[in-house]
Structures are given as structure tokens and as C-alpha cells.
């Protein structure tokens, strides 16, 4: 008798994706982050669902409804902090996942990579709108500053901003629609992740060497299911440690103050995972230029496959490119630090230099270095 998992219409899909999937025998722990992102998404959807049962998206009651969740709902504080810090874990996994793709040349799978870039935008949009919902000072002013950037667009800018706000400022209409979008977007992300996997399974996984691994495949289960479970346990350990020991470590104290349109906080800044893009935005004195740089800081990832000049796919055997990759990582950490600093000397010039270096590395220096490495190997 044929195995049910290979014949049943539904089980067949699961089987070909997670059980009998042929996987390269040498993929390292850097390939764990896909499954970790899936777990993060499930955690966020579940905790978000329970939060939505008690949350009210009205400017008069939003802040107190979050307080009510933390004080009066059974384990409400736990659900709230799991959701808030789960977002941080989500972004840590995302950045490591993208970094892995850049290092090992996974971007050569064009469809998978481009859907990944789209997913990154969708997750960032979701996180931004989620940050507005508690209706604290940083929620309100963050929403005001970031949505106001759209007014830099020629002709349609100011109309577009008022259309998004649903009025002449960030108010009840804005909060209500942000809540609606924040609720629906994770399901769109889940669907996109399904398409991401679909395209990945068309080609099969890349591996650290960047070479074709068709001659040496092993079944996904039990080898990589066990490996993924270990990764998930470590993720849950990190998340629960953060939630139970230092839940406010990554938050902003200003968000424990009720939103007040008449009182501007001294330093308006987004959550830590947006600080690198925020630093790039601030480093350009022109409003429209800043907005373009902000969008391009993420969109530049879509151009990376077309700038691949090396004869080798992975950076595993390319020491010069490796060096530049780690300079890029250091540059992004510098930008993250600068994004959280006030706009004053010497932070302004450091931010501008780091922003220029970021784009130069990706668009110019790395492709030229790859050509140089080809010549070194007489290819």
C-alpha cells in the first residue's frame, strides 16, 4: 500500500515541503532562520489575536485599554510583552536571514529574493503601524513624522498625507485604519511567505559553498526538522528571557506617556529595528531626497542580483568580499547607533558618511572587488 502522506492531496503538499524535500547535506545553522521567521510570524499572529480581543482602537481609550490588558487581563502583560519583543526577535531573524542571503549569494534565485524584499517591506509596514497602536507619545509623534514624509512627493504629497490621516492630523481615523491594516497585513505576509517557499522549492536551497548540490541531497526529515526544532527552542529561550527579565529593554520610555499633540518629545525616534533607515533619512538635508534614500536603503536589495560580477556564487572562498561584507555589517550597526542619537555634531557627519558608505559598498565597491577577485584567480 502506498504511503498516505504521498497520496493524500493535502498531506502530499506538506510531505513535499517539509518531509521528503531533498535538501543539501551541508547547509549550516544560517539556514535555520527561515523556519524561525515562520515561528515568529505564528507567535505574532496568536499573541496579536488575543491582544485584539481586549484592545480598542479609539484615541480616547487606546492607551487605557493597553494598561487594562497589562493589569486586569489574565497573563495580559505576558501576551503584550511577547508581542512587543516578538517583533524585535522577528527583525533580528529577518536581518540575519537577509545577511545570510547576501553572504552566500542566495539572491541569485531571483523570484525568491524579490518576494523576500517585498516581505521585508510588508513586515516593516506592519511593525510601524503596530507601534502606533498603544497611543503613547512616541506612537503619536512617530506616526506624525513618518506619514508626514509623504508630503514631500510632488503634486500629490499633501493630499496623500491627509488621505492617509483621514483628516488634518493623526487622529481617531488614523488609529482605526492603522489597527485594521495591522490586523490584516500578517495574513498577507503569511501568504507571501507561502509563495516565497513555493519559488524556493522550484530551485532547491542554496548551500554555503554556492555549488550545485544535486549529487548530494538528504531528506529534510529527520535531519533538518530536528535542527530547526533546536533553533526554535533557542529562539523561545531568548524571547522568554527578554520578556520575563527585561521586557522594556528595547522599548522607549516616552511610550508610557499618553499621546499629547501639544507636547513634542525631545527626541522622536522609531523602534531600534528602523534606526538604520531613519539615520539614512536624516542624513540628507532635503526632505524629498531623504524619503527617496529611506526607500532606496531597502529597495537597493532588489538590485543586488544584477550587480553580482563574481564567477563564484558564495563569498565562502572570496576573502576580499568577506571583508567588505563585514564592513557593511559594521556600517549598518553604526547607522543604527546614529539613528538613536540627537541631530547634532558629531553625529550628523558620522551619519552622512555611514549612509554614503552603505550605498557605495553595495552599488560600487563590492561589484568592483568581485571583478578584481576574478582576475586574481585568472578567470
Curated annotation (Swiss-Prot):
Cofactor names: heme b
Annotated GO biological process: mitochondrial electron transport, ubiquinol to cytochrome c
Positions bound to heme b b566: 97, 196
Compartments where located: Mitochondrion inner membrane
Protein residues bound to a ubiquinone: 201
Entry keywords, A to Z: Electron transport, Heme, Iron, Membrane, Metal-binding, Mitochondrion, Mitochondrion inner membrane, Respiratory chain, Transmembrane, Transmembrane helix, Transport, Ubiquinone
Bilayer topology term: Multi-pass membrane protein
Binding site for heme b b562: 83, 182
Recorded GO CC terms: mitochondrial inner membrane; respiratory chain complex III
Transmembrane segments: 33-53, 77-98, 113-133, 178-198, 226-246, 288-308, 320-340, 347-367
Transmembrane helix found in the keyword field: yes
InterPro entries hit by this protein: Cyt_b/b6_C, Cyt_b/b6_C_sf, Cyt_b/b6_N, Cytb/b6-like_sf, Cytochrome_b, Cytochrome_b_C_euk/bac, Cytochrome_b_N_euk/bac, Di-haem_cyt_TM
Co-factor binding details: Binds 2 heme b groups non-covalently.
Main localization, broad class: mitochondrion
CDD domains linked to this entry: cytochrome_b_C, Cytochrome_b_N
Single GO MF descriptor: metal ion binding
Main function: Component of the ubiquinol-cytochrome c reductase complex (complex III or cytochrome b-c1 complex) that is part of the mitochondrial respiratory chain. The b-c1 complex mediates electron transfer from ubiquinol to cytochrome c. Contributes to the generation of a proton gradient across the mitochondrial membrane that is then used for ATP synthesis.
Subunit organization: The cytochrome bc1 complex contains 11 subunits: 3 respiratory subunits (MT-CYB, CYC1 and UQCRFS1), 2 core proteins (UQCRC1 and UQCRC2) and 6 low-molecular weight proteins (UQCRH/QCR6, UQCRB/QCR7, UQCRQ/QCR8, UQCR10/QCR9, UQCR11/QCR10 and a cleavage product of UQCRFS1). This cytochrome bc1 complex then forms a dimer.
Miscellaneous notes: Heme 1 (or BL or b562) is low-potential and absorbs at about 562 nm, and heme 2 (or BH or b566) is high-potential and absorbs at about 566 nm.
Family listed: Belongs to the cytochrome b family.
Protein name stated in the entry: Cytochrome b
Organismal lineage: Eukaryota, Metazoa, Chordata, Craniata, Vertebrata
Originating gene: MT-CYB
Amino acid at each position: 500500500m502506498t504511503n498516505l502522506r504521498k497520496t493524500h492531496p493535502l498531506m502530499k503538499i506538506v510531505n513535499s515541503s517539509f518531509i521528503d524535500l531533498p535538501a543539501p547535506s551541508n547547509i549550516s545553522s544560517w539556514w535555520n532562520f527561515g523556519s524561525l521567521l515562520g515561528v515568529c510570524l505564528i507567535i505574532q499572529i496568536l499573541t496579536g489575536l488575543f491582544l485584539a480581543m481586549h484592545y480598542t482602537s479609539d484615541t480616547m481609550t487606546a492607551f487605557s485599554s493597553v494598561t487594562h490588558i497589562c493589569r486586569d487581563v489574565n497573563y495580559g502583560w505576558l501576551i503584550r510583552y511577547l508581542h512587543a519583543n516578538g517583533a524585535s526577535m522577528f527583525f533580528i531573524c529577518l536581518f540575519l536571514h537577509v545577511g545570510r542571503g547576501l553572504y552566500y549569494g542566495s539572491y541569485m534565485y531571483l523570484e525568491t529574493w524579490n518576494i523576500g524584499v517585498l516581505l521585508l517591506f510588508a513586515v516593516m509596514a506592519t511593525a510601524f503601524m503596530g507601534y502606533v497602536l498603544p497611543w503613547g507619545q512616541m506612537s503619536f509623534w512617530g506616526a506624525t513624522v513618518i506619514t508626514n514624509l509623504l508630503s514631500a512627493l510632488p503634486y500629490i504629497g499633501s493630499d496623500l498625507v491627509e488621505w492617509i490621516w483621514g483628516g488634518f492630523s493623526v487622529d481617531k481615523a488614523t488609529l482605526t485604519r492603522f489597527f485594521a491594516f495591522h490586523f490584516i497585513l500578517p495574513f498577507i505576509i503569511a501568504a507571501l511567505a507561502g509563495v516565497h517557499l513555493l519559488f524556493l522549492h522550484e530551485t532547491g536551497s542554496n548551500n554555503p559553498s554556492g555549488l550545485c548540490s544535486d549529487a548530494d541531497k538528504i531528506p529534510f526529515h529527520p535531519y533538518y526538522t530536528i535542527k530547526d526544532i533546536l533553533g526554535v527552542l533557542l529562539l523561545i529561550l531568548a524571547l522568554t528571557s527578554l520578556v520575563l527579565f527585561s521586557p522594556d529593554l528595547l522599548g522607549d520610555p516616552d511610550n508610557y506617556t499618553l499621546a499629547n499633540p501639544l507636547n513634542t518629545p525631545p527626541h522622536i525616534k522609531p523602534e531600534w529595528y528602523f534606526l538604520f533607515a531613519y539615520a539614512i533619512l536624516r542624513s540628507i538635508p532635503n526632505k524629498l531626497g531623504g524619503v527617496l534614500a529611506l526607500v532606496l536603503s531597502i529597495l537597493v536589495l532588489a538590485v543586488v542580483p544584477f550587480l553580482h560580477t563574481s564567477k563564484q556564487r558564495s563569498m565562502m572562498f572570496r576573502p576580499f568580499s568577506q571583508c567588505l561584507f563585514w564592513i557593511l555589517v559594521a556600517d549598518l550597526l553604526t547607522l543604527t547607533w546614529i539613528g538613536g542619537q540627537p541631530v547634532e555634531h558629531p553625529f550628523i557627519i558620522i551619519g552622512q558618511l555611514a549612509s554614503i558608505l552603505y550605498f557605495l559598498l553595495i552599488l560600487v565597491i563590492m561589484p568592483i572587488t568581485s571583478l578584481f577577485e576574478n582576475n586574481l584567480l585568472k578567470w
